[in-house]
Amino acid sequence: MKIKNAEFITSAAKTADYPAGNIPEVALAGRSNVGKSSLLNRLVNRKSLARISSTPGRTRLINFFLVNGLFRLVDLPGYGYAKVSARERQGWRRMVEEYLKTRENLKGVVLLVDSRHPPTVLDVQMYEWLKYQGIPAAVAATKADKISRSKRAQSLKVIREVLNLTAKEPLVFFSAETSEGREEMLEVIGRWVGLSGR
């Protein structure tokens, strides 16, 4: 799938603020600072479409981006950020759950995990929850440029084991720095939104 253009549409905290229409959507989920905004920018080949922060927890709303005028990428607030109040974390969780459970436009979720470390308990909970809800999911192992080739097989093995992935469930090494994994991830997204090969 070739990306010709991408634009920020809106930020939303509740259902009433979601974009109207039946354009298919793919959401990006993961821990704070795992690289969701960087992955989004690399997928659409724009350096600063989604704001990147070195401070975890900066994405506090659900951000919608229109791609090729045909589908939306949706950047969800990260989970697991400790330096906010329990009340605020609970609010983010409710916001994300409401989107994932009620959004009819949603066709799939890319769960980002850091390739350098085993998935966290929260990563496992999120992946199991997506499967329980019947939402198609793929895993992007981010920061792939920071892991040596010799350690990759072990990293993949650990991620598959911890998340209990089958061989058919997509797992892609991804680097926002080198573009590794970009085409594979776009192929997965293209299948979900009905644009495979376009």
Curated annotation (Swiss-Prot):
* Chain ranges of the EngB-type G domain: 22-195
Query: Recorded GO terms, molecular function?
Result: GTP binding; metal ion binding
> Organism's domain of life?
Bacteria
A Pfam family of the record is: MMR_HSR1
A GO cellular component annotation here is: cytosol
Binding-site positions, Mg(2+) = S37, T59
Is Nucleotide-binding included in the keywords of this UniProt record?
A: yes
Question: For this chain's UniProt record, which GO biological process terms are given?
Answer: division septum assembly
> Which cofactors does this gene product need?
Mg(2+)
| Annotated signal peptide | none
Q: Quick check: keyword Nucleotide-binding in the entry?
A: yes
| UniProt: GTP binding residues | 30-37, 57-61, 75-78, 142-145, 174-176
Alphabetized UniProt keyword annotations = Cell cycle, Cell division, GTP-binding, Magnesium, Metal-binding, Nucleotide-binding, Septation
InterPro entries (alphabetical): G_ENGB_dom, GTP-bd, GTP-bd_ribosome_bio_YsxC, P-loop_NTPase, Small_GTP-bd
The entry's family comment says:
Belongs to the TRAFAC class TrmE-Era-EngA-EngB-Septin-like GTPase superfamily. EngB GTPase family.
Q: What does this protein do?
A: Necessary for normal cell division and for the maintenance of normal septation.
Query: In its UniProt entry, what is this protein called?
Result: Probable GTP-binding protein EngB
Q: Which organism is it from?
A: Pelotomaculum thermopropionicum (strain DSM 13744 / JCM 10971 / SI)
Taxonomic path: Bacteria, Bacillati, Bacillota, Clostridia, Eubacteriales
> What gene, per UniProt, encodes this protein?
engB
